[in-house]
Structure formats: C-alpha cells, structure tokens
Regions:
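Internal mixed beta-strand/loop scaffold within catalytic domains of large alpha/beta enzymes
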Residues: 1-13
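Core active-site phosphate/anionic-ligand binding loop and the adjoining beta-turn-alpha structural block
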Residues: 14-18
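Charged, compositionally biased interaction regions
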Residues: 19-296
C-alpha cells in the first residue's frame, strides 16, 4: 500500500513449487512484524535458504521451482477482472466475483525456472478446506491464548478455518467462557471463522469423534452457546449475503460451544463409561495385529 499511496508500482516476487511448510506459513497469522520465512526455519529445524531477486531485492526461497519478478501498478492505473476460483471453502469464489472489484495485475520483468519444474497444485476440490499434515496456526493460537492470560490449556486445534477447538482444565467459574471468547479474537483464528468449541481436558481436540461426542452430551443449547456478531470474515465466505458483499461489510457471526462439564456442579456430572487413554493405547498395541480396532 505504501507504494500505491504514492502512485508507484509495488515490486513483487511470485514463487511456485515451494516447500509445503513455506505455503502453510504464508497464510498463517503470525505475530505482526515477524517474518514468515524466519518462522519456516523454526518449523523445518534450520534456516530456509533464500536468494535475493536481482531486480527487486526481495527474498526468493532457493528451492522454488519457478520464480517471477515484477511489479504491481496501483489498481487505479491498471487492473482486470479475475476469477472465480475453486476456493478452500469448497465453492467457486474470490477474485472479482468475491470483492466486486477488478484485481491487481503483475507486470512480469523476469522469470527464473528449473528444467522440468515440479509444481504443487490443487484442483478445485470438494468439500474444500483440504490441509497438509501441518497446522502451524494451532500452535500460534495456543501461544496467543497463553499470552492473553488463559490458564491451563491442554490442547488447541484448527480443523479448518471454520472450526477451532480448545481443550482446557477448568480452574474457576467462567474459565471456559474466557477461553472461548479469547480464541474467537486472537489473530490466529479471528478471520474466516464460524465455530469455536471449548472442551474439557479428557477430550482430544484433534479427534472430531471425541469433539462431537462432547458437544452432543455436554452442551445445553439454551445456555451453552454464545453468538457473537460483526466478526472479521472474508469475501470468500459462501454464506455472506449479497447485500453485505456489495457494501464490503465482510463480517459474519460466530457460535461458541461450551462443551464442558458445568463448573458449578462438575463433581456431580456423570462419570464417563470409557477406559483411560493409556489403557486403550496399551490394548491396541498388544492386540492390534489380531483385532481390527477402529481408528480414533
């Protein structure tokens, strides 16, 4: 924006065929003014090798299969209709269709490539929200929750941007509500969301079977669901009404489910009829080659 505000073109680099962790961190809400490339190094266990673009001076991951250097003129100077695309929610969206505006263009100045480049692509997929087996946003959200003063968090998981689950060991009345509303507002989960679920420490937040069981047995719909309106959303939201999209009011509502034992009478809550996690793991390990135990 600082270039466009001065009427100048903004130098850019577009890279293709990246390490999957580079892609994962590129759209993760890390701390402001922190480098995504530095965070990649922290995840892969060593510095990410980069080159400086000869024309722009911008960093280019050295393992990229293709890299393009160029500049983006202000949209008022040049822009074009684009899209829609098969986006992560599982619908055709984005581009001009999503924003109602023409999109910026890149004036290509140089192209660098490997022979026979291998590209990592995604066809339009349904039901959407396909993920690689790396979820840095969950760890970042956990850190942000603890920084916000939320105590005794035992697990955090973003199943998709639409569903965040936080497991806590309840310490005081209102603890679950505090955790749920904090998860809703921390930057790692604030945008594109729909549902937040708070569960007790006996529930594995990564296991949807356990999370759904907690929601079905510990949530009283009249008292354990909070609705929060006016939250940070995106033009890619398929449920956004046309009127809000046209006025560029890219906000939505969220639901927070408190799927926990009520703190005030948690000691009187029925005991679960399940063996301990440790015993289950021991049995599966001992008899797994004989009995086809269901996963999860």
């Amino acid at each position: 924006m600082k270039y466009w505000e001065q009427g100048k073109s903004c130098p850019v680099v577009a890279t293709f065929g990246l390490h999957p962790i580079v892609f994962a961190l590129s759209h993760t809400k890390i701390a402001w003014e922190h480098s995504e490339l530095d965070n990649v190094g922290g995840v892969i266990g060593g510095p990410l090798e980069i080159l400086r673009g000869p024309l722009t001076g911008l960093p280019i991951p050295a393992s990229s299969e293709i890299a393009i250097e160029g500049e983006v003129p202000p949209p008022s100077v040049e822009s074009r209709a684009e899209g829609p695309f098969g986006e992560w929610p599982g619908y055709y969206s984005g581009g001009t269709l999503g924003t109602g505006e023409p999109q910026p263009v890149i004036k290509v100045k140089a192209v660098y490539y490997r022979n026979d480049p291998i590209l990592e692509d995604e066809a339009p997929l349904w039901p959407g929200a396909v993920k690689i087996d790396a979820n840095p946003a969950s760890g970042i959200l956990w850190d942000q929750l603890e920084s916000a003063g939320i105590q005794d968090i035992v697990g955090v998981y973003n199943h998709t941007p639409y569903l965040t689950v936080v497991a806590i060991k309840q310490r005081y009345a209102g603890h679950a509500k505090q955790a749920g509303h904090a998860a809703l507002t921390c930057s790692a989960a604030a945008r594109n969301g729909r549902y937040v679920v708070v569960v007790d420490e006996d529930i594995d937040p990564t296991n949807m079977k356990e999370v759904l069981w907690a929601m079905m047995t510990r949530v009283d719909p009249a008292t354990n669901i909070d609705i929060v309106d006016g939250c940070w959303s995106t033009p890619l939201d398929p449920r956004m009404p046309p009127s809000k999209r046209e006025s560029k009011d890219h906000t939505n509502s969220r639901a927070i489910f408190f799927a926990v034992r009520p703190f005030e009478w948690r000691d009187k809550f029925p005991k679960t009829s399940r063996t301990s996690r440790e015993l289950r793991e021991e049995v599966v390990k001992k008899f797994g080659n004989v009995i086809p135990f269901p996963k999860g």
